[in-house]
Amino acid sequence: MLKIVFMGTPEFSVPSLEKLIENYDVRAVLTQPDKPKGRGKKLAMSEVKEVAVKNNIPVFQPVKLKNDIEVINKLKEIAPDFIVVVAFGQILSKEVLDIPKYACINLHASLLPNYRGAAPINWAIINGETKTGNTTMIMAEGLDTGDMLLKDEVDIKRDMTAGELHDILMNRGADLLVKTIDEFSKGNIKPEKQGEPETDYAAMLSKDTGKINWNDKSERIYNLIRGLNPWPLAYSSYNDKVMKIHEAKILDAAPEGEPGLITNVDNNGIEVNSSDGKILITKIQFPGKKSMNVGEYIRGNNIDKGVILK
């Protein structure tokens, strides 16, 4: 049975680790150090660590793997056939990349070379793509630049959020990894060099990424709202209060007045002008409050027509 060392941290990595445990001999799991979570700021394990502990697999949590001689020596001792990396959150040194018998394989949630970087799922939706997918590749020292192995294409539906796409790619990625390891270990996959990307780098998201510019077209605003749901969420300023926008629709209507102007509020939502039409905001959240459908929110609170969202 093939020996595997797995490296990953967030929820996206979990189905991959579970599939690897089902199919191979997973000797060790590396994940990021426990982080303070919630109001009590108690240290919490990563989702990946929880799975490893449940399956009695040794866990290592180096702050910086490339500087951790002890962990690197342990990996050399294990002498894995493959190191498999899914959203680990650290760049691997050449010393680590050279450890496995076959290769270090990475699962990346885009059709490489497009959308290299930390947030490929979000940027594919923000940019209005209709297709994306997963790519497995042999890891090189650069970020997401290694030779490609297998791809799996996925359609992005018109109303799909980043959260929904994340879950599809997360589950399909696990199957693609197993297929990649099986075929690669038998010599059935010819690695393919990456060409030049046709898209921008998929940079890490920050809360500022979500600020809506109402001078943009409706399509652009709608894609931003979908692409940042469930985190960090698109937002606008209503009377100097941050209004996070969870859900919206494009209205088939011409703008009335300047961009950002609220032209109507009712149980269906808040109508707002864009540069070329209108957006209907249907689900919102104000600081310290839970998210609510607009119809529910306006039963106890005011959203005034004529206010300009900034």
UniProtKB/Swiss-Prot annotation:
Keyword flag DNA-binding: no
Catalytically driven reaction(s): L-methionyl-tRNA(fMet) + (6R)-10-formyltetrahydrofolate = N-formyl-L-methionyl-tRNA(fMet) + (6S)-5,6,7,8-tetrahydrofolate + H(+)
Alphabetical UniProt keywords: Protein biosynthesis, Transferase
SUPFAM superfamilies found in the cross-reference section: FMT C-terminal domain-like, Formyltransferase
GO cellular component terms listed in the entry, alphabetical order: cytosol
Signal peptide start and end residues: none
Binding site for (6S)-5,6,7,8-tetrahydrofolate: S110, L111, L112, P113
GO MF term (any one): methionyl-tRNA formyltransferase activity
InterPro entries tied to this protein: Fmt, Formyl_trans_C, Formyl_transf_N, Formyl_transf_N_sf, Formyl_transferase-like_C_sf, Met-tRNA-FMT_C, Met-tRNA-FMT_N
EC class: transferase
CDD domains with a match to the protein in the record: FMT_core_Met-tRNA-FMT_N, Met_tRNA_FMT_C
E.C. no: 2.1.2.9
Family according to the record: Belongs to the Fmt family.
Free-text function comment from the UniProt entry: Attaches a formyl group to the free amino group of methionyl-tRNA(fMet). The formyl group appears to play a dual role in the initiator identity of N-formylmethionyl-tRNA by promoting its recognition by IF2 and preventing the misappropriation of this tRNA by the elongation apparatus.
Entries under HAMAP family matching the protein: Formyl_trans
Official protein name in the record: Methionyl-tRNA formyltransferase
Lineage: Bacteria, Bacillati, Bacillota, Clostridia, Eubacteriales
Gene name tied to this protein: fmt
